[in-house]
Amino acid sequence: IIYIFLVYRLSIKTKIFSFILIICLIYPTFLTLNNDYKHRYFSDIRLIIGENGLKNYLDNSTYGSHRNVAKEIFLDNPLFGVGIKNFRFESANEKYDNLEHKYNHKRVSNHPHELYYEFLSETGIFGLICFLIFIISSISLSLKNYLKHRNIYQLSSLIFVCVSILPIIPSGAFLSTMVSSIFWINYAIMIGYNKVNKN
């Protein structure tokens, strides 16, 4: 959707109206067709907008239990974590059976559903620092290049990459899912235009 709005020369009013219309058509349809998603969506929204907001959500959801065990895994393995794609095994370790969380019994998952918890638990502080240096320097270089050449494809990929690394936003397994494929495609476009514009 972002590509369409950036590429086609439409007035800002038309873009905003089109975006709202698309969301208003797609979202309710998706909720209607998938009962599990609908239930999860509305129960999560109730927790977030209720008293104590985000804290309440993290204390009373399975995602909160994933983050809680990820934090404990990181504290047990602070430098290098437990290894890429090993959260699924380590979260099932019986030493985490007695963590204080309402849904601790549902803590076992393929990944912690949040980028920074995933990096901290699987690669430790070393892996997270390496990733941050790598991604921030890439974004900085691409932003400078965009400001110089104003390439809208690079801008849309830059926006996608920046939004994908925002803290607290739930995410898929960053190193092994379709979500990560989409991220790396956008990253490649973002970086690729740096080289194109130098030639």
Predicted features by range, described:
Residues 1-5, 24, 131-134, 157-169, ...:
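Transmembrane alpha-helices of multi-pass inner-membrane enzymes
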Residues 6-8, 14, 122-165:
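Hydrophobic transmembrane alpha-helices and their immediate junctions
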Residues 7-55, 68-76, 84, 89:
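A membrane-periplasm/extracellular boundary helix in multi-pass inner-membrane enzymes
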Residues 12-17, 148, 194-199:
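Transmembrane signal-anchor hairpin modules in multi-pass inner-membrane enzymes, especially those
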Residues 28-32, 62, 138-145, 165-169, ...:
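Hydrophobic membrane-targeting alpha-helices
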Residues 37, 41, 142-150, 174, ...:
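Membrane-interfacial segments
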Residues 54-68, 72-76, 80-123:
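Long extracytoplasmic/lumenal interhelical loops at the membrane interface
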Residues 69, 90, 115, 119, ...:
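Generic recognition of well-ordered alpha-helical segments
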